[in-house]
Amino acid sequence: MSAVPLRNNKPGRAEVRSITVLGATGSIGESTMDLLRGAPERYRVEALTGNSNVQGLAKLAREFKPGFVAVADPARLNELRDALAGTGIACGAGESAIIEAAARPADWVMAAVSGAAGLKPALAAVDRGATVALANKECLVCAGDFFMQRAAQAGACILPADSEHNALFQALSSGNREELVRVIITASGGPFRTWAAADIEQATLAQALKHPNWSMGQKITIDSASMMNKGLEVIEASYLFALSPDEIDVLVHPQSIVHGMVEFSDRSVVAQLGAPDMRIPIAHCLGWPDRIAGPSARLDLAKIGTLTFEAPDFVRFPGLRLAYDSLRTGRGATTVYNAANEVAVAAFAAGQIRFGAIARLVEATLEHWTRSGNQAPLTSADDAIAIDHDARKTAAGLLPQIAAKAS
């Protein structure tokens, strides 16, 4: 039994739904809060968490009046308590408090804590059978099989909250699993879509951060420039929808209007279109199984005029190839891929390596891990976190060597 409901056969919900937002002060969290703000009669906030933006978190808490608020940094607990003095809102700090927030009895949980730190809180929500809007990549990239099995066992409902997987989720409902031929994830191509390989190699941080369509944080914008983000999305799609690598294609689509497509055995291709606005897929998750009115601009195809598509270049963007390789390898390779990429992106942002060295560091880390013989199925969150930790350590150790080769 899948934890992702590919057929909408549930009745709509008229009652007020209780909501928890993990990562409320991040970009996904802010979009979620914006949607909640627009429909106070439909939603009641149970708990909110944030990383280190205590004042932003406190402001949201005063507005939405949740029962519990938690900040990830334990050293900020007193600051949070002071900011919420007189409200009667319970406060917590640290990993245990974030997990406590996720475990509270909310109908719907937005899992938007970034990084490996988001895995255990998401599992806490899953274990009580909640509906979880999943915006944390690491839950799937680092522990996909384990995470989805646990969700199915608990009777949890996993709704993909990012634009591409939400598009596939919507399109897949048009047919049955045995009728599926492939899914197609679209990619903008990023700022270097038309650049020569030699120019991509030397790209600066400022150039990498000039995404043509989306407004995102630094790390994901760099991932978009390298197409590592699309590699991560291929991995996520495989675990979310139980697809083999051969059933997942990537298509470059510079306008970012078509977010995902599904081809069925009768050769019909069903696509989901929308403006590049994260509130659209989040609204779909928030309203599911109904649809709710959202604040996003309506799509005007006549104004856009032209939609174009092209094949991805695995030579200029080797990070995409490495994602497919790690997915086929399995047994923790996707965890290594993600961890090494995070180390590489941080090194590039700090000026330690060239842009082109990001993929080389990821590949070197994967090769080192393969030679180590430490591959084994993941059976717990701690297994995934241990592989993630070891891969980061390996990547950091290989960093001087990769940097020297590029100089």
Curated annotation (Swiss-Prot):
Enzyme class: oxidoreductase
HAMAP family given in the database record: DXP_reductoisom (MF_00183)
Enzyme Commission number(s): 1.1.1.267
Transmembrane segments: none
Manganese listed as a keyword: yes
GO MF term list: 1-deoxy-D-xylulose-5-phosphate reductoisomerase activity; manganese ion binding; NADPH binding
Gene3D superfamilies named among the record's database cross-references: 1.10.1740.10, NAD(P)-binding Rossmann-like Domain
Binding site for NADPH: 25-28, 53, 136, 138, 217
Binding site for Mn(2+): 162, 164, 233
Gene: dxr
Organism expressing this protein natively: Bradyrhizobium sp. (strain BTAi1 / ATCC BAA-1182)
Function: Catalyzes the NADPH-dependent rearrangement and reduction of 1-deoxy-D-xylulose-5-phosphate (DXP) to 2-C-methyl-D-erythritol 4-phosphate (MEP).
Similarity comment: Belongs to the DXR family.
A biological process term (GO) from this entry: isopentenyl diphosphate biosynthetic process, methylerythritol 4-phosphate pathway involved in terpenoid biosynthetic process
Keywords per UniProt: Isoprene biosynthesis, Manganese, Metal-binding, NADP, Oxidoreductase
Binding site for 1-deoxy-D-xylulose 5-phosphate: 137, 163-164, 188, 211, 224, 229-230, 233
Pathway(s) per entry: Isoprenoid biosynthesis; isopentenyl diphosphate biosynthesis via DXP pathway; isopentenyl diphosphate from 1-deoxy-D-xylulose 5-phosphate: step 1/6
Domain of life assignment: Bacteria
Cofactor: Mg(2+); Mn(2+)
Catalytic activity, as annotated: 2-C-methyl-D-erythritol 4-phosphate + NADP(+) = 1-deoxy-D-xylulose 5-phosphate + NADPH + H(+)
Protein name: 1-deoxy-D-xylulose 5-phosphate reductoisomerase
A Pfam family that the UniProt record links to this protein: DXP_reductoisom
